[in-house]
Regions:
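Structural motif
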Residues: 10, 76-77, 117
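N-terminal Rossmann NAD(P)H-binding glycine-rich loop of SDR-like oxidoreductase domains
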Residues: 8-33
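Conserved Rossmann-fold NAD(P)-dependent oxidoreductase catalytic core, especially the SDR/UDP-sugar
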Residues: 34, 92-149, 153-156
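Substrate-positioning beta->alpha
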Residues: 169-187
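Flexible, glycine-rich beta-alpha linker
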Residues: 129-133, 153-175
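Conserved glycine-rich Rossmann-like NAD(P)H-binding loop of the short-chain dehydrogenase/reductase
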Residues: 33-41
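NAD(P)H-binding glycine-rich loop region in Rossmannoid oxidoreductase-like domains
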Residues: 43, 53-101, 105, 109, ...
Length: 188
C-alpha cells in the first residue's frame, strides 16, 4: 500500500479530523497530494475510513514543538486547519496556546525542514487586540503567518459553526467549496 504513496507530495494537515478537514483531505487527494493528518492522540478514530486508507496519520500535539517538528518532517507543504473554538481550562489549553503557540510551532517546523508553502485557515473578524479572546488569539496567530518568510495563503471564512456550542452552521456545499479552494492553493 505505501509504495503507491511514493509518487505523491506529502502535505501535513492539522485539524484533519474536524468539520473542514473532513472535506480538505479528500480534495488534497484529488489534487494529487498525500495528506499526513497530524491528530491528537486518541482522535484517530474520527478519521473517515475512506480517507484514512488514502492518507498517513501521525499522532501529535501542536503545543509541543518537538512533536510538530517530527510531524512536519518530509512534507512539502502545511495546511493548518486546527482550531479550538472553546477554551478548555480543565485540559489546560487556553486560546493563546491552542492558536498562537501552535502556529509558532508550525512556522518553526516549516523553517527547520525547508517547507515553503503554508495554507492557514483563520476566521473572519480575527484581529490582535480584539476584546474577545478567541478572535484575539486567532488574529495573533494570523499575524505570525503574515509576518513569516513562507509562501503563505490565509483564508478568513465566516465561522461555519456556532461559537457557543460548536454545532455546524454551514452547508456541506460551503465546506466542499472552501476545501477545494484550500487544496487548489497548495499548488501555488
Amino acid at each position: 500500500m505505501y509504495s503507491a504513496f511514493m509518487q505523491y507530495k506529502e502535505v501535513l494537515v492539522t485539524g484533519g479530523t474536524g468539520p473542514l478537514g473532513r472535506y480538505v483531505c479528500p480534495s488534497l487527494i484529488v489534487h494529487g497530494f498525500l495528506p499526513r493528518l497530524f491528530v491528537r492522540l486518541g482522535s484517530e478514530g474520527r478519521i473517515a475510513p475512506d480517507v484514512r486508507e488514502r492518507c498517513r496519520v501521525t499522532p501529535g500535539d501542536l503545543t509541543v514543538r518537538e512533536s510538530v517538528e517530527m510531524g512536519a518532517q518530509g512534507t512539502s507543504a502545511i495546511v493548518h486547519l486546527a482550531e479550538m473554538w472553546k477554551e478548555q481550562p480543565p485540559r489546560g489549553i487556553p486560546f493563546e496556546e491552542a492558536h498562537v503557540h501552535a502556529t509558532a510551532n508550525i512556522l518553526h517546523s516549516a523553517s527547520l525542514w525547508g517547507i515553503r508553502r503554508l495554507i492557514f485557515v483563520s476566521v473572519a473578524g480575527a484581529r490582535p487586540g480584539d476584546t474577545d479572546p478567541y478572535f484575539d488569539a486567532r488574529g495573533k496567530a494570523e499575524a505570525l503567518v503574515r509576518g513569516s518568510q513562507l509562501s503563505w495563503t490565509v483564508f478568513r471564512p465566516a465561522p461555519w459553526y456556532d461559537l457557543r456550542d460548536g454545532a455546524p452552521r454551514a452547508s456541506p456545499k460551503y465546506l466542499e467549496g472552501l476545501a477545494e479552494a484550500i487544496a487548489e492553493s497548495v499548488r501555488r
